[in-house]
């Protein structure tokens, strides 16, 4: 099997684990929307790679692996906070916004600091600079798309009247 097949297989396993763990501890709906954020971010990043004339290769796959944990973590942090605030009394939409506001600054700080660190890779010159150029491109696209997804799409999907209960607990 080639490397891409292995990464895709591991991606499916990771997606299943996210669904199970979040379904057990939060709700199936929350688990579903967090899981959806992963392929949305990855597909958006692939689209961005195409726009910049880059391709999927060993270095870009390394970038995907590197950033995937951050993308999943940010989605989980936002979703858990929204889930917590949705269970409180009051206006549902205000509670969703409060859940987002509670954790958005640490998430944004993480995203920006990672983007700054990865941007320094663009300063590398020579053969090595040309060789790893696609790594920060992947990370920057993924983080930017993930940021848009977790600040706009994820809260909108989780803003429903129904308070979901955990699947098992």
Tell me what each language-model feature is.
Residues 20-25, 44-59, 108-159:
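Hydrophobic, glycine/alanine-rich multi-pass transmembrane helices and their short helix-loop junctions
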Residues 1-19, 120:
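Juxtamembrane "pre-transmembrane" interface segments
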Residues 4-5, 79, 84-109:
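Helix-loop junctions and hydrophobic alpha-helical segments within the transmembrane domains
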Residues 3, 35, 39, 48, ...:
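Residue-level signature of catalytic and energy-coupling elements of molecular machines
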Residues 10-15, 38-43, 111-115:
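Hydrophobic alpha-helical transmembrane bundles that constitute the permease/transmembrane domains
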Residues 4-12, 36, 60-64, 100, ...:
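Internal alpha-helical transmembrane segments of multi-pass membrane proteins, especially GPCRs
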């Amino acid at each position: 099997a080639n490397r891409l097949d292995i990464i895709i297989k591991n991606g499916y396993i990771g997606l299943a684990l996210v669904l199970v763990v979040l379904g057990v501890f939060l709700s199936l709906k929350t688990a579903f929307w967090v899981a959806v954020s992963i392929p949305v971010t990855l597909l958006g990043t692939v689209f961005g790679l195409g726009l910049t004339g880059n391709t999927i290769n060993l270095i870009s796959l390394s970038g995907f692996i590197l950033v995937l944990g951050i993308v999943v973590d940010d989605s989980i942090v936002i979703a858990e906070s929204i889930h917590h605030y949705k269970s409180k009394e009051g206006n549902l939409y205000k509670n969703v916004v409060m859940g987002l506001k509670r954790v958005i600054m640490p998430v944004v700080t993480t995203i920006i600091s990672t983007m700054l660190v990865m941007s320094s890779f663009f300063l590398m010159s020579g053969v090595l600079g040309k060789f790893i150029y696609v790594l920060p491109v992947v990370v920057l696209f993924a983080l930017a798309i993930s940021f848009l997804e977790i600040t706009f799409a994820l809260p909108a999907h989780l803003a429903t009247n129904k308070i979901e209960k955990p699947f098992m607990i």
